[in-house]
C-alpha cells in the first residue's frame, strides 16, 4: 500500500555527478532510474524536476562574466540535458517518460502545460519537467514547488545527500540534531536553508508538505512511499 498517489520528486543536478567532479555519472543515473521505476510499478504518479548544477549553475555564471539572465538561461538548458538523460535511463527500465520544457524547444521536449503534465501522470507516464520556471532569477527548488502545486501533487520529495533536516550542518557540527518533522514557521525562525525562501513560501501558502531524504541510499525512495519513517517532513 503506497502512502501517496501523486508526487513531485526534486533531484539535484550535483547528485547526478556521483563521485565525479562534473557531468553525469552513468551508475548514479541508472540507480535513480531503477528507484523511480519501482514507484511507477507501485502505481505512483510521478513528476520530476532536476537541477542543472552538475553542468552549469546560473548564479555562478555572474562570476565568469555572464550577466545573470544569460547565466540562468544556461542553467535552464543544463536541466534539460539532465532530464533527457533521465528519460533515456527510464526507458531502459521499460518506463514511459515524457520530457516537458518551460521554454519552447520542440522536438527536444514538449512545451509544458499543467494539463499535458497531468495527462501524462494519469497515463502512468513519468512527467519530467525541465528548464526551471522558464524565467531567470528562480531556482529549481522554486520550479519544483511550482510544478508540484500545479500538478496537484500530494507531497514534494526533495532527494538530497543527507538523510533529513538538521539543526546545523551535520558534516560540520557533531551536535547537530535531526528533526523527524518541522513546521515551515520553525524553518523560518531557525533560518534553516532547506530551500530558498520563494520555494518555501510557495509550499507553505499552498499547504504542500516537503519530505527531505537521502536519495543516494538505494531503496529509500520506495521506503518513503510505503510509509517508512525516514527523512524529515516539513509541513
Feature locations, PLM:
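C-terminal catalytic "cap/lid" subdomain
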Residues: 1-235
Amino acid at each position: 500500500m503506497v502512502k501517496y498517489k501523486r508526487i513531485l520528486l526534486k533531484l539535484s543536478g550535483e547528485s547526478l555527478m556521483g563521485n565525479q567532479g562534473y557531468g553525469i555519472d552513468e551508475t548514479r543515473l541508472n540507480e535513480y532510474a531503477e528507484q523511480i521505476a519501482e514507484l511507477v510499478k507501485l502505481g505512483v504518479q510521478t513528476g520530476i524536476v532536476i537541477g542543472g548544477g552538475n553542468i552549469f549553475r546560473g548564479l555562478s555564471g555572474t562570476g565568469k562574466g555572464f550577466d545573470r539572465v544569460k547565466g540562468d538561461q544556461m542553467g535552464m538548458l543544463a536541466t534539460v540535458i539532465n532530464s533527457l538523460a533521465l528519460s533515456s535511463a527510464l526507458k531502459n527500465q521499460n518506463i514511459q517518460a515524457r520530457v516537458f520544457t518551460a521554454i519552447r524547444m520542440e522536438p527536444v521536449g514538449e512545451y509544458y502545460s499543467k494539463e499535458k503534465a497531468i495527462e501524462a501522470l494519469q497515463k502512468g507516464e513519468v512527467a519530467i519537467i525541465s528548464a526551471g520556471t522558464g524565467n531567470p532569477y528562480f531556482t529549481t527548488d522554486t520550479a519544483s514547488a511550482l510544478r508540484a502545486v500545479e500538478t496537484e501533487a500530494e507531497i514534494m520529495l526533495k532527494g538530497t545527500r543527507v538523510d533529513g533536516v538538521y539543526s546545523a550542518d551535520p558534516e560540520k557540527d557533531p551536535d547537530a540534531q535531526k528533526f523527524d518533522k518541522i513546521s515551515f514557521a520553525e524553518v523560518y525562525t531557525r533560518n534553516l536553508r532547506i530551500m530558498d525562501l520563494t520555494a518555501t513560501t510557495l509550499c507553505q501558502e499552498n499547504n504542500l508538505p516537503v519530505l527531505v531524504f537521502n536519495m543516494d541510499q538505494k531503496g529509500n525512495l520506495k521506503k518513503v512511499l510505503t510509509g517508512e519513517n525516514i527523512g524529515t517532513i516539513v509541513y
